[in-house]
Amino acid sequence: AYEMLGAHPVTQDGQEMWHFAVWAPNARAVSLIGEFNQWDRGKTPMQKVYDGTWEVRLPAKTFDVKSDPKRYDYPDAAKKLTTYKYCIQAQDGTWQDKADPYGFAMQMRPDTASRIYDLSGYRWGDADWMEARKSYDPYHSPVNIYEMHLGSWRRHKDGTFLTYTEIAEQLVPYLKEMGYTHVEFMPVMEHPLDMSWGYQVSGYYAATARFGEPKELMALIDALHQAGIGVLLDWVPAHFPRDAMGLRRFDGTPCYEHPDPRRGDMPQWGTHMFDYARGEVNSFMLSNACFWLEWYHADGLRVDAVTSMLMYDFCREPGQWLPN
């Protein structure tokens, strides 16, 4: 699904373009907004094409500061010009701005916009590891896993985060010295709240901007593989936060969450549960699992909060849940 939805560079009639597509089945209208059009929902309307999907294409130069050097003469203009959201009109006429569920990059919190980002072009150096992995038998091989949270493992003296690059420089020799065969990263997907440690995901396809760019996370995993260390990622397919820019009531109706709060709400966590019975949601989640394995060369996923997906009475009082 991530190959069709989200923002992707394409070529049309010899011209470089960016193609945007979003699933919002019950929306009355959808517009693409961003720094490129002053966040004006009237400037870039999207067209509804099929199965509740909306799309639009724009020339790649639209997102280049060279298109108007005088207008974009301010700090970080090049990066800000890549930001975008979908402005979605619900059936009741109200509008809301949403980050791209399939966006490959997002702004650093507290900002919440998605960013166009071309994931292609990274030159992996872990071919030997990937080939050896095909015949690796974890059931008959020693496994020693180091679980860690990138944001709290180590920091600069002033309390700021290390970058993906800095983590790679320090983590690889540490794991080798301590004899670990694998490292398990707590969620590296984008999330709005530091205190959640990444377990309330807002950008399922976006490597968190706290530590750098997506390709720098690729380089971290690449360095680990070249050192003979496997990489496991914590993955959170059970629930998602209620932040206004996220998946909650995405087009004004429950799209990703179950419409019945007895299935769709997790009272203890203050989050929504995914509606696994919906094909589009299944596609979103299964595609996401494949995405991290394929694009980031992750060696496996540790699935979080499985009990909450299997036991509908988990952390719920009588009357707050429905039986199977």
Regions found by a protein language model. Name each.
Residues W23-V30, W39:
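Short proline/glycine-enriched turn/loop motifs at strand-loop junctions of beta-rich domains
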Residues A1-H19, K48-E147, S152-G159, E166:
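The feature marks proteins involved in alpha-glucan
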Residues Q107, A127-V143, H149-N324:
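Substrate-binding/active-site clefts of carbohydrate-active enzymes
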Residues P9-T11, F36, A60, M189, ...:
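Short, well-ordered turn and helix-capping elements at secondary-structure junctions
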Residues V30-L32, Y84:
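Short beta-strand elements bearing conserved aromatic residues within extracellular beta-rich modules
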Residues K43-Q47:
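Beta-strand-rich interaction surfaces with strong enrichment in secreted/lumenal proteins
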